[in-house]
Amino acid sequence: MSEKHLFTSESVSEGHPDKVADQISDAILDAILAQDPHAHVACETVVYTGTVNVFGEISTSAYVDIAHVVRETIKKIGYTDSENGFDYKSVGVHVSLVEQSSDIAQGVNEAEEVRDKNGQLVDPLDLIGAGDQGMMFGFATNETAEYMPLAISLSHKLVKKLADLRKSGEISYLRPDAKSQVTVEYDNNGKAKRVDTVVISTQHAATATNEEIHDDVINKVIKAIIPAELLDDETKYFINPTGRFVIGGPQGDSGLTGRKIIVDTYGGYAPHGGGAFSGKDATKVDRSASYAARYVAKNIVAAGLADKAQIQLSYAIGVATPTSINVETFGTGKVSDDELLAAIRKVFDLRPAGIIQMLDLLRPIYGQTAAYGHFGRTDIELPWEQTDKVEELKAVLGK
């Protein structure tokens, strides 16, 4: 008997401690960008029982009441009761923010391409150098309507549904912290065939019984989100498998910005360069170039030029032009990868300033990305999720 071809991804809710930290960092970023679009921000957050620490490097003309932003973010997530060990009213907020290093700033504010010309700017998009070295990946597949791998897409939707049911009051015993995990079985041709296993752990009131949690999660969450044709009698369900999840959120575990980078991206289906997103402005290519790489990959697949596309970009700190661009279509390309790479160079400007201009990234749009994934979102409008380069790519390739 042959083994099944299985792939698993997970997601976490907005009340998960790491996601609380991400949302605080991005809320602070947005508050600063609303006043100063050209601010340089690298904001980290640690949350644990009764305490939030905010630290990092920021260069801005804006004034932001950091503690107020922190409390409002926690309130919006749903930590409003001191019985949970963490609530927006009583939490202690400690802020330690300093100015960005001048050594880094000189390379970001004036890229090597400008410095090599003794400050004489030829192309204004050469002005901004990458905020750091590193490699970033973008991915897209026609496996789902949102051009995302199925396992991570379903995982995000499950925890988002839990949050919606909690906030609407339909399931009154739900609390903010939750996790999901979905295992998808693929056929021998690499096509998603069925959902093999679903794991959901959700924080709950002490009065809730395991039976009602199990029934509600199966009927109001899983069956509401996962298409019936993907579920069968062999699908396995693990609902709160420890048997109890009353202590959760920052009371149960500490949380840190940037610790859910696989949840934020493709659920492990594609490589990750290692850099986190939240709390970083668009001069940080960890964030902006990852968004650009997704934008490129999604437009390639949406144009029908490949069934799957993976883009790798890399940068040197203080240099505008990428040090490398790589495209991989896993044998699904309708044109060669070399032809695609040439088309990418013509259609997309992948210098930091080019990305910022192309995707309009100086706006306070980041808080909405800090939970439920940065890619494949259908509930919010994100510039890197647009497929507005499809026709231009086709034209360049003569399609």
From Swiss-Prot:
Annotated stretches, region: Flexible loop: 100-110
Binding, L-methionine: 57, 100, 253, 284
Residue numbers binding Mg(2+): 18
Keyword Transferase assigned: yes
Positions that bind K(+): 44
Pathway assigned to this chain's UniProt record: Amino-acid biosynthesis; S-adenosyl-L-methionine biosynthesis; S-adenosyl-L-methionine from L-methionine: step 1/1
Pfam families: S-AdoMet_synt_C, S-AdoMet_synt_M, S-AdoMet_synt_N
Cofactor needs: Mg(2+); K(+)
GO cellular component: cytoplasm
GO biological process: one-carbon metabolic process; S-adenosylmethionine biosynthetic process
Binding site for ATP: 16, 177-179, 244-245, 253, 259-260, 276, 280
InterPro entries, sorted: ADOMET_SYNTHASE_CS, S-AdoMet_synt_C, S-AdoMet_synt_central, S-AdoMet_synt_N, S-AdoMet_synthetase, S-AdoMet_synthetase_sfam
Molecular functions per Gene Ontology: ATP binding; magnesium ion binding; methionine adenosyltransferase activity
Enzyme class: transferase
Subcellular location: Cytoplasm
EC numbers on record: 2.5.1.6
CDD domains with a match to the protein in the record: S-AdoMet_synt
Keywords: ATP-binding, Cytoplasm, Magnesium, Metal-binding, Nucleotide-binding, One-carbon metabolism, Potassium, Transferase
Reaction(s) the record says it catalyses: L-methionine + ATP + H2O = S-adenosyl-L-methionine + phosphate + diphosphate
Cofactor: binding details: Binds 2 divalent ions per subunit. Binds 1 potassium ion per subunit.
Quaternary structure annotation from Swiss-Prot or TrEMBL: Homotetramer; dimer of dimers.
Xref: HAMAP family: S_AdoMet_synth1
Record-stated family: Belongs to the AdoMet synthase family.
Function: Catalyzes the formation of S-adenosylmethionine (AdoMet) from methionine and ATP. The overall synthetic reaction is composed of two sequential steps, AdoMet formation and the subsequent tripolyphosphate hydrolysis which occurs prior to release of AdoMet from the enzyme.
Protein name: S-adenosylmethionine synthase
Lineage: Bacteria, Bacillati, Bacillota, Bacilli, Lactobacillales
